[in-house]
């Protein structure tokens, strides 16, 4: 087991080739076996620093043909390799692990890329966030390794896909997610895009509920697509509950590791009805709901499902949520609750920097 990574804690990891990717690969003999051959690839250190700052952890994965044999003595490898590691470390670049296959191709070992031997622990111990991790290397075998691991890959080429371009591609992935939730009672598809304020399509089969979900997206300033096929011939319970779970889950996935977000949100608009929302994207589901309704339904939506929506939403998003409403009109009170949730979300998901807003180092 790798002591640097915690089992079953999925993290953003970049598996990076060495020769031809981090440093130049000599054209003549393909071996970096003395200090004179040690030349870094352009922009590699600034790019790695950007990626580290965004929460990526770095692992080096390299084939070194015949390492430790007369054709490539260990001491010839060590001098330039150790200097490379010292330079990287002096500039703030930290590789959590260095994985090397020393075998020739014809030895048919299990660890030579693109085989999975070198990264077996990462795959079996639950270290990898498969949605955000990647392989970076200059050869097609690196691409094949990424395919075998089930993560994306970037085939480095100094002229056409250099380090700045790779870092940009990894860092500028939109904060969006799609969740499909299918049960015996409902078939639901939710897509959220936190960095897109255009209007989405919402169709739950419950007109008033559609209007309320639109309030969340509109006041949250993000795009949300919701399509629900539920057992409305019975009642609205399953449709509302499962939709809330799916929306919360989609928002949680879109937020990723939450690095740079404000984390907290608060809203207290005052109209005929007062709605209040305190939100903490804490990773821990908790709900405190305070509102009373006189009517059994608002539109086609049962008012008893309003607190249930917020509880299920908090479970799906894994957030701490305090919501309350006061007023004389049930329609206005319900609408105030959904509006303030959207407003609080707008504050909480806003990117303000690149630091994880938690003393624990995880949310």
From Swiss-Prot:
Annotated localization: Cytoplasm
Binding residues for Mg(2+): 17, 19, 138
Region Imidazoleglycerol-phosphate dehydratase: start-end pairs: 175-363
Annotated EC: 3.1.3.15, 4.2.1.19
Chain segments carrying region Histidinol-phosphatase: 1-174
InterPro entries to which the protein is assigned, alphabetical: HAD-like_sf, HAD-SF_hydro_IIIA, HAD_sf, His_synth_bifunc_HisB, HisB_N, Histidinol-phos, IGPD_sf, ImidazoleglycerolP_deHydtase
GO CC, any one term: cytoplasm
Substrates-to-products reaction catalysed: D-erythro-1-(imidazol-4-yl)glycerol 3-phosphate = 3-(imidazol-4-yl)-2-oxopropyl phosphate + H2O; L-histidinol phosphate + H2O = L-histidinol + phosphate
Active site positions: 17, 19
The entry's keywords: Amino-acid biosynthesis, Cytoplasm, Histidine biosynthesis, Hydrolase, Lyase, Magnesium, Metal-binding, Multifunctional enzyme, Zinc
SUPFAM superfamilies referenced in this protein's UniProt entry, alphabetically: HAD-like, Ribosomal protein S5 domain 2-like
S-S bridge residues: none
Gene3D superfamilies from the UniProt entry: HAD superfamily/HAD-like, Imidazole glycerol phosphate dehydratase, domain 1
Similarity remark: In the N-terminal section; belongs to the histidinol-phosphatase family. In the C-terminal section; belongs to the imidazoleglycerol-phosphate dehydratase family.
PANTHER family membership: IMIDAZOLEGLYCEROL-PHOSPHATE DEHYDRATASE, IMIDAZOLEGLYCEROL-PHOSPHATE DEHYDRATASE HIS7
Name of this chain's protein: Histidine biosynthesis bifunctional protein HisB
Species, as recorded: Shewanella oneidensis (strain ATCC 700550 / JCM 31522 / CIP 106686 / LMG 19005 / NCIMB 14063 / MR-1)
Gene designation: hisB
């Amino acid at each position: 087991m790798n002591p640097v990574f915690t089992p079953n804690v999925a993290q953003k990891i970049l598996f990076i080739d060495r020769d031809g990717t981090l440093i130049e690969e000599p054209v003549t003999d393909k071996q970096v076996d003395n200090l004179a051959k040690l030349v870094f690839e352009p922009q590699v250190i600034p790019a790695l620093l950007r990626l580290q700052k965004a929460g990526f952890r770095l692992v080096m994965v390299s084939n070194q043909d015949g390492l430790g044999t007369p054709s490539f003595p260990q001491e010839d490898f060590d001098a330039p390799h150790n200097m490379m590691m010292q330079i990287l470390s002096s500039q703030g670049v930290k590789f959590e692990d260095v994985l090397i296959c020393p075998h020739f191709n014809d030895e048919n070992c299990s660890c030579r890329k693109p085989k999975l031997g070198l990264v077996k622990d990462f795959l079996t111990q639950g270290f990898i966030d498969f949605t955000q991790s990647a392989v970076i290397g200059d050869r097609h075998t690196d691409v094949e390794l990424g395919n075998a691991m089930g993560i994306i890959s970037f085939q480095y080429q100094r002229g056409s896909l250099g380090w700045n371009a790779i870092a940009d591609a990894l860092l500028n992935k939109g904060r969006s997610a799609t969740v499909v939730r299918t049960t015996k009672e409902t078939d639901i598809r939710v897509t959220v895009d936190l960095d897109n304020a255009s209007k989405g399509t919402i169709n739950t089969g419950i007109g008033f509920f559609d209007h309320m979900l639109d309030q969340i997206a509109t006041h949250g300033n993000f795009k949300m697509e919701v399509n629900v096929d539920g057992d409305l011939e019975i009642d609205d319970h399953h449709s509302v509950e499962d939709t809330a779970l799916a929306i919360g889950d989609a928002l949680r996935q879109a937020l990723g590791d939450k690095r740079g977000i404000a984390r907290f949100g608060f809203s207290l608009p005052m109209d005929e009805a007062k709605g209040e929302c305190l939100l903490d994207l804490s990773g821990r589901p908790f709900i405190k709901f305070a509102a009373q309704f006189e009517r059994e339904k608002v539109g086609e939506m049962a008012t008893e499902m309003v607190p249930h929506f917020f509880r299920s939403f908090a479970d799906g998003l894994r957030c701490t949520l305090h919501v309350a409403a006061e007023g004389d009109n049930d329609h206005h009170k319900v609408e105030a609750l959904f509006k303030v949730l959207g407003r609080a979300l707008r504050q909480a998901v806003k990117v303000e920097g690149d630091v994880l807003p938690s003393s624990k180092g995880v949310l």
